[in-house]
Design a protein with these regions (language model features):
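Positively charged, low-complexity intrinsically disordered leader regions
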Residues: 1-27
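Short beta-strand segments enriched in small/hydrophobic residues
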Residues: 31-39
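Glycine-rich phosphate/diphosphate-binding loop of Rossmann-like nucleotide-binding domains
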Residues: 38-52, 136-226, 235, 239-250
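Short beta-strand elements in bilobed, periplasmic/extracellular small-molecule ligand-binding domains
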Residues: 55-69, 186-188
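Short, well-structured alpha-helical segments in soluble
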Residues: 75-87
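Anion-binding alpha/beta catalytic cores of soluble intermediary-metabolism enzymes, centered on
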Residues: 93-157
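Glycine-rich, N-terminal phosphate-binding loop of Rossmann-like dinucleotide-binding domains
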Residues: 96, 210, 230-231
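Rossmann-fold NAD(P)-binding glycine/threonine-rich loop
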Residues: 105-112, 116, 125, 231-285
Length: 286
């Protein structure tokens, strides 16, 4: 079964729009997300436009701050500090990747934890891994989108063997933790993993986030596996594809996400959820 992130995202955004529509009467305003775009990378510009469109659908106020590609690191940090201090701003997102003169870790850490809608701040990462009772932490958007997709497909995670190919702070590590929290047994693979195809074939749930076009083929997947493709690559014909060879894997999978239209729309959807969460956490703290 191919599960559409586009369809699920549309349903969830409609539900969020109903929620946000009640905010002016309750709180006097709607959430406000600020996205900072440094440079003119075409891919980043597309991502930022898609985020703005999603905000418009949900009813979230959104502002895009555009800075030239040669912006000094300190200038970007000063802008973040300004937005951190602005009480009308609920969420701050700096579009990655950044130009080489700017340290991504330094920028991520500069964003206030309470406005970190990406969930990348070290304190949010720590809260996710510590799983503190009653703690409110923002979960990275792509991993949360994957969980939403599996849950919407009524796929039982508990007791399953999950293999995650990729160990990034953005996807691989946090999705491993979310799967663990739902009682899966998780194996994390990476570029140095030996016998990777053999390990992948043991997976009931296979999450692929390695950044290599059509890396996972049908002979690496066992019958009935749930396959989640996080990749966004270009194939030999110049067409958009994922890290999974959909044509050979789809006949074997019980559940599979396409590229495009799978995980991508859910990433943006969960960004909207995180922005609303940051807004409501601020309101509750007053």
């Amino acid at each position: 079964m191919t599960i559409s992130g586009k369809d699920l995202a549309a349903r969830l955004k409609a539900r969020m729009a109903e929620q946000v529509a009640t905010f002016p009467a309750k709180y006097g305003r709607v959430p406000h997300l600020v996205v900072i775009l440094v440079g003119d990378d075409p891919g980043s510009q597309t991502y930022v436009k898609n985020k703005a469109k999603a905000c418009d659908v949900v009813g979230i106020r959104n502002t895009t701050v555009r800075m030239p590609g040669d912006t000094p690191e300190q200038e970007l940090l000063d802008k973040i500090a300004e937005l951190n201090a602005d009480d009308t701003v609920d969420g701050i997102l700096v579009q990655l990747p950044l130009p080489k003169q700017i340290s991504e870790p330094k920028v991520i850490e500069a964003i206030s934890q309470s406005k970190d809608v990406d969930g990348f701040h070290p304190l949010n990462t720590a809260a996710l891994w510590q799983k503190r009772p009653n703690s409110s932490c923002v979960v990275p958007c792509t991993p949360m989108g994957i969980i939403r997709l599996l849950e919407d497909a009524n796929y039982e995670i508990a007791g399953k063997n999950a293999v995650v190919i990729g160990r990034s702070q953005i996807v691989g590590l946090p999705i491993s933790k979310l799967l663990l929290d739902r009682n899966a047994t998780v194996t994390i693979c990476h570029s140095r993993t030996k016998n990777l195809p053999e390990i992948a074939r043991q997976a009931d749930i296979l999450v692929v986030a390695i950044g290599r076009a059509k890396f996972v083929t049908g002979d690496m997947v066992k019958d009935g596996a749930a396959v989640i493709d996080v990749g966004m690559d270009i194939d030999e014909n110049g067409k958009l594809c994922g890290d999974v060879d959909f044509a050979s894997v789809e006949p074997k999978a019980s559940v599979i996400t396409p590229v495009p239209g799978g995980v991508g729309p859910m990433t943006i959807c969960c960004l909207m959820e995180n922005t609303i969460q940051c807004f409501l956490d601020k309101v509750a703290a007053r």
